[in-house]
Amino acid sequence: MDIISLGWSSLLVVFTFSLSLVVWGRNGF
């Protein structure tokens, strides 16, 4: 596993996590 694919996967994880936080915030848990 090289640096580029590792960076893309971590970026995707952070994006998904922040997106889920925004959805949770709008729903008010």
UniProtKB/Swiss-Prot annotation:
<feature type="transmembrane region" description="Helical">
    <location>
        <begin position="3"/>
        <end position="23"/>
    </location>
</feature>
<dbReference type="GO" id="GO:0009535">
    <property type="term" value="C:chloroplast thylakoid membrane"/>
</dbReference>
<keyword id="KW-0934">Plastid</keyword>
<comment type="similarity">
    <text>Belongs to the PetN family.</text>
</comment>
<keyword id="KW-0602">Photosynthesis</keyword>
<keyword id="KW-0249">Electron transport</keyword>
<dbReference type="GO" id="GO:0045158">
    <property type="term" value="F:electron transporter, transferring electrons within cytochrome b6/f complex of photosystem II activity"/>
</dbReference>
<dbReference type="GO" id="GO:0017004">
    <property type="term" value="P:cytochrome complex assembly"/>
</dbReference>
<comment type="subunit">
    <text>The 4 large subunits of the cytochrome b6-f complex are cytochrome b6, subunit IV (17 kDa polypeptide, PetD), cytochrome f and the Rieske protein, while the 4 small subunits are PetG, PetL, PetM and PetN. The complex functions as a dimer.</text>
</comment>
<protein>
    <recommendedName>
        <fullName>Cytochrome b6-f complex subunit 8</fullName>
    </recommendedName>
</protein>
<comment type="function">
    <text>Component of the cytochrome b6-f complex, which mediates electron transfer between photosystem II (PSII) and photosystem I (PSI), cyclic electron flow around PSI, and state transitions.</text>
</comment>
<dbReference type="GO" id="GO:0015979">
    <property type="term" value="P:photosynthesis"/>
</dbReference>
<keyword id="KW-0812">Transmembrane</keyword>
<keyword id="KW-0472">Membrane</keyword>
<keyword id="KW-0813">Transport</keyword>
<keyword id="KW-0150">Chloroplast</keyword>
<dbReference type="GO" id="GO:0009512">
    <property type="term" value="C:cytochrome b6f complex"/>
</dbReference>
<dbReference type="Pfam" id="PF03742">
    <property type="entry name" value="PetN"/>
</dbReference>
<dbReference type="InterPro" id="IPR036143">
    <property type="entry name" value="Cytochr_b6-f_cplx_su8_sf"/>
</dbReference>
<keyword id="KW-1133">Transmembrane helix</keyword>
<keyword id="KW-0793">Thylakoid</keyword>
<dbReference type="InterPro" id="IPR005497">
    <property type="entry name" value="Cytochrome_b6-f_cplx_su8"/>
</dbReference>
